[in-house]
Amino acid sequence: MKRSFLNVFCAVAILAAIILTLAACGGDKKGQTTAAFDAENAFSRLLSEVKYAETLSDTSSSADFMFSDLPQNAEIKMYTCESGSHPDELIMMKGAKEEDVQALETAAKTHLTELTAQLRDYNPQEVPRVENAVVCTNGLYVFVCVTDDVETTKAILK
């Protein structure tokens, strides 16, 4: 009983952290990217300026497997740790239209929840990194960044 309560409490805490992150980093509500925001440039900066546990590799070719429920014509770029021993990753999803953004945000939240559950079983010391992931929406774009370098990530996505 005590373990079930702890699992429920942790799940609620994770969801609350994700929701607060989304609220703090949300873009405009009409799905339009602000003129000052260049998503491709932000992605490049996130790759080069943010500190990750190890080198990230382009794993975009496996993104369809991890995100099978994305809206039609959604685009995704995904970089993950080469060895797979750390959860650090950078994901940029782009919806084809404004209505896709909510589905992309849901996919991002679901991905982080599933990643947290996996880590609890085999690498629990990495769970806080995922719980503190930055999820940011700007226009048609949704970014997910799992790293300890949260401040740099937020500054780039601002």
Which positions does each model-derived feature cover?
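Bacterial N-terminal signal peptides that target proteins for export
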Residues: M1-V12
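C-terminal motif of bacterial Sec signal peptides marking the signal peptidase cleavage site
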Residues: L20-A24
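Bacterial signal peptide processing site
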Residues: G26-K29
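Post-signal peptide N-terminal segment of mature Sec-exported envelope proteins
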Residues: Q32-A53
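Short, compositionally biased low-complexity segments enriched in polar/charged residues
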Residues: T55-P87, D100
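Mature extracytoplasmic domains of secretory-pathway proteins
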Residues: Y79-T113
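A short, solvent-exposed beta-edge/loop patch
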Residues: E82, Q125-K158
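Short Gly/Thr-rich strand-loop-strand
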Residues: V101-N138
